[in-house]
Amino acid sequence: ELKIRGAGVFSGYWNNDELNEAIFDEEGYFITGDLFEIIEENDEDRYYRVVGRVKDIIVRSGMKISPQELEDILQTHPAVKEVALIPYPDGIHGEISCACIVPVEGQNLTLEVVNDYLREHKIASFKLPEKLVTLDQLPRNAVGKLLKAHLREVVKNEVNA
């Protein structure tokens, strides 16, 4: 998880000690909520890539699944126009992943096709989506941001229909 500190980092919320304690660690670093990986490192520099948000992680039987990792791969599938992975409640595993896909017009995707594609990209079996919902479009706000809470409701209705 990315933590930052410096002159350009804000010093906290005005009159909100409780929230400030939650977003700053004991050394004064701001906890961003972003997950990252080091993509290149040498003696002088490090290069990082943000790979998602902590709050978006899917926890299946204690194993962590990054939706962004799977979305990045599935977005390269020729039959996928748009994709989002969200957690889905499960009585055995706690959460499982559900792939919400807008297929390219005229294309038909199945969970088997999706998971075969992910396996070709060396994705571990515990990360594979266990549900697939195909949609005409992903719910977005006026500026194009994915509405994940709305998407969870759509998925709940689709799966329980």
Predicted regions and their residues:
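A structural motif
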Residues: 1-4
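AMP-binding/adenylate-forming catalytic core of the ANL superfamily
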Residues: 6, 11-12, 21, 35-127, ...
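Short Gly/Pro-enriched turn/cap motifs at secondary-structure boundaries
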Residues: 23-28
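Acidic/polar alpha-helix N-cap and adjacent early helical turns
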Residues: 154-161
